[in-house]
């Protein structure tokens, strides 16, 4: 099966996009074509939108933290289509102004201060008793210092690092749409499930994930 990549861009950016693609993929061949059509007469369609499971400040797992090329999982699903089937993954992006990073910085600070993940522990009366006894025996300043040190763990440090790394990148509003076409609703839905599963690789347990909407 042949997998095609289409890029729809404003006319004044065509040259820029062509140069960018060939700079990363020197063997690629780019040509202008008519708009494609997935659908055929009497075809059945299944589709969904993918969106972030948590707030946008939390990053996804990217290829830097993967052991394999993430495109392989996606292309493997598309390569198994039969002659009567079709599928498309549409990603629309639009850059946003700087300022979105502010929420990420605030969230990173909250995590370090244990406000974001430590709320339930603050409701535990044993924690209150322990803090009170520590305050009486060793003083407030020392207790605060110990709490600040204890709040940071390798997992928290890694999470905060990932958030801060995301804040250094250009921000985009993004729309991801998956479309599956087949000769029956059952087959179209099954194909869509396979397509959605390919995006599980971008999930992390402590940050973000892509979920169906």
Segments predicted by a language model, with ranges:
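Extended, folded cores of ATP/NTP-driven motor/assembly subunits in large transport
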Residues: 1-213
